[in-house]
């Protein structure tokens, strides 16, 4: 895609631009904030950051062919034949989003975009909506923590550690969806992505939105629960189309805030018949869940190959969204639930023939813990052994809560790294341990920062009938430390630990 710089700038808010040095009559072919991704005639945005400053990479970007630099401070040296656009620090991300949206011809306006937000369940709801729409024969694309599909029909793993990528990537991906004749685009819309500080999603035109729940997460970024809530409410307030609507979890304490933020909405509940869709019965088995729900006085019977009442919530959100967006008969969508399958890293069972069970899950918040641990305890025929950590440089207050919940349900706990980042691993582990009051260190509570060794320890402790749960990493392919990222595969780590245990038992 090629455009004239002046044609893009003419459509942008001129108040955001402080100064332009150089020609506007340049041809540009791409937009990026990463010097690693720069190609000839790319616009390079020098974003200020926590660890790195994009201004330090301007010369690298120019050497690789960038002919337009967007910066927030004056340069000591200006390269000839390069145009410099100066904006405020505070506005540079907003300007990048505006610019990307215009450069890619406002792709979200050519799609019906579905946004899913909430503390827990976002990725699963996105995936279930994706599967149901595909089952209905609809051309669909999506962006989530785990997978991307730009409409070419194949899933690729999310190449970023961000659930919601930067605006340059969002609009490029939406543009590819338009090229692939996608009708519906599903975006996992995180609070980080919705926040005006990152401005990743401010230029996305949403048609329908889903709210799953609000829990204790990301307060290190938002500061207060109210700021966190407001970021998510922004998604609902952005639905401008008169035909647009929201799907809301009636059981969440903040339900009314979301209902008031959108003109039209549908609610679901596992507790109250006042909701538009009320789940009246749930029967959980180890490999499936049967449930019944009412809508407008009609009773529906559903069965899915997933475990847990929390998954019933996620299924209901997806079912309602798809039935309403397609104006389909409810029973028709219920019949399609056979296509629903678990997302990678969500309630993944690892069975190599061992006499105990192992489950891997991405759960990393107190809300997710409070939903999953009762299920784990119920299906553990003997002891429950949990392995988990908590993210470094993230919400500190949740660590105590994670430990407290795990302590109630677990017989043995092994604490380890999740993503320590710049924090000391043992400091994080000891923060979690403050919530664990019913265990004794080195008897039924173990501090092993190295996640591989921690999993090996948990597996070595397992007896017949035990359930070992490894939480917090799920699908993720790395563990982040201060100065490095360690490749990680939770499935492989668990499998190797089981195989090592079997080998050691043979040698006895």
UniProtKB/Swiss-Prot annotation:
Residues that bear N6-carboxylysine: 232
Binding sites annotated in the UniProt record for ATP: 118-124
Record's GO cellular component terms: cytoplasm
Single GO MF annotation: ATP binding
Gene for this chain: murE
Localization of this protein: Cytoplasm
EC numbers: 6.3.2.-
Main location: cytoplasm
A GO biological process held by the record: peptidoglycan biosynthetic process
Entry comment on modification after translation: Carboxylation is probably crucial for Mg(2+) binding and, consequently, for the gamma-phosphate positioning of ATP.
Pathway as given in its UniProt record: Cell wall biogenesis; peptidoglycan biosynthesis
Keywords: ATP-binding, Cell cycle, Cell division, Cell shape, Cell wall biogenesis/degradation, Cytoplasm, Ligase, Nucleotide-binding, Peptidoglycan synthesis
Record: residues binding UDP-N-acetyl-alpha-D-muramoyl-L-alanyl-D-glutamate: 35, 163-164, 190, 200
Database matches in InterPro entries: Mur-like_cat_sf (IPR036565), Mur_ligase_C (IPR004101), Mur_ligase_C_dom_sf (IPR036615), Mur_ligase_cen (IPR013221), Mur_ligase_N (IPR000713), MurE/MurF_N (IPR035911), UDP-N-AcMur-Glu-dNH2Pim_ligase (IPR005761)
SUPFAM superfamilies: MurD-like peptide ligases, catalytic domain, MurD-like peptide ligases, peptide-binding domain, MurE/MurF N-terminal domain
Family note: Belongs to the MurCDEF family. MurE subfamily.
Identification of the protein by name: UDP-N-acetylmuramyl-tripeptide synthetase
Function, in words: Catalyzes the addition of an amino acid to the nucleotide precursor UDP-N-acetylmuramoyl-L-alanyl-D-glutamate (UMAG) in the biosynthesis of bacterial cell-wall peptidoglycan.
């Amino acid at each position: 895609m090629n455009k004239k710089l002046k044609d893009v700038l003419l459509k942008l808010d001129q108040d955001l631009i402080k100064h332009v040095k150089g020609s506007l009559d340049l041809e540009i072919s791409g937009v990026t904030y990463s010097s690693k991704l720069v190609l000839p005639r790319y616009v390079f945005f020098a974003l200020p950051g926590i660890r790195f400053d994009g201004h330090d990479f301007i010369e690298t970007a120019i050497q690789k062919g960038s002919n337009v630099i967007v910066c927030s401070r004056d340069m000591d040296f200006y390269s000839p034949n390069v145009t410099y656009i100066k904006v405020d620090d505070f506005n540079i991300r907003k300007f990048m989003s505006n610019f990307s949206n215009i450069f890619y011809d406002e792709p979200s306006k050519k799609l019906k975009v579905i946004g899913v937000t909430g503390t827990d369940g976002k990725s699963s709801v996105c995936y279930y909506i994706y599967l149901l729409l595909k089952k209905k024969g609809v051309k669909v694309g999506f962006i989530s923590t785990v997978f991307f599909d730009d409409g070419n029909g194949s899933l690729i793993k999310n190449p970023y550690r961000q659930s919601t990528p930067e605006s340059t990537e969002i609009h490029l991906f939406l543009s590819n969806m338009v090229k692939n004749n996608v009708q519906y685009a599903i975006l996992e819309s995180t609070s980080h992505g919705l926040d005006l500080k990152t401005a990743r999603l401010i230029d996305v035109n949403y048609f329908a939105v889903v709210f799953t729940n609000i829990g204790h997460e990301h307060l290190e970024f938002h500061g207060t629960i109210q700021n966190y809530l407001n970021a998510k409410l922004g998604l609902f307030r952005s639905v401008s189309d008169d035909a647009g609507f929201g799907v809301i979890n009636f059981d969440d304490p903040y339900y009314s805030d979301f209902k008031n933020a959108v003109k039209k909405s549908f609610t679901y509940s596992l507790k109250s018949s006042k909701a538009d869709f009320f789940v009246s019965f749930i029967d959980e088995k180890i490999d499936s869940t049967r449930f019944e729900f009412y809508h407008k006085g009609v009773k529906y019977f559903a069965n899915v190959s997933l475990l847990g009442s929390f998954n019933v919530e996620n299924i209901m959100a997806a079912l309602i969204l798809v039935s309403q967006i397609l104006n389909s008969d409810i029973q028709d969508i219920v019949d399609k639930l056979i296509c629903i399958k678990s997302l990678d890293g969500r309630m993944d069972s690892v069975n190599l023939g061992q006499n105990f069970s192992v489950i891997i899950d991405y759960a990393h918040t107190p809300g997710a813990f409070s939903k999953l641990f009762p299920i784990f305890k119920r299906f553990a025929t003997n002891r429950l052994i949990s392995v988990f950590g908590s993210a470094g440089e993230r919400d500190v207050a949740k660590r105590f809560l994670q430990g407290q919940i795990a302590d109630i349900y677990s017989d043995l706990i092994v604490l380890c790294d999740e993503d320590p980042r710049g924090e000391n691993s043992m400091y994080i582990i000891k923060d979690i341990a403050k919530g664990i009051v019913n265990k004794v260190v080195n008897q039924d509570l173990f501090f092993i920062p190295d996640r591989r060794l921690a999993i090996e320890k948990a597996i070595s402790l397992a007896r017949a009938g035990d359930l070992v749960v490894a939480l917090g990493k799920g699908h993720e392919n790395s563990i982040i430390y201060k100065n490095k990222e360690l490749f990680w595969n939770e499935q492989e780590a668990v499998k190797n630990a089981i195989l090592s245990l079997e080998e050691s038992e043979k040698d006895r």
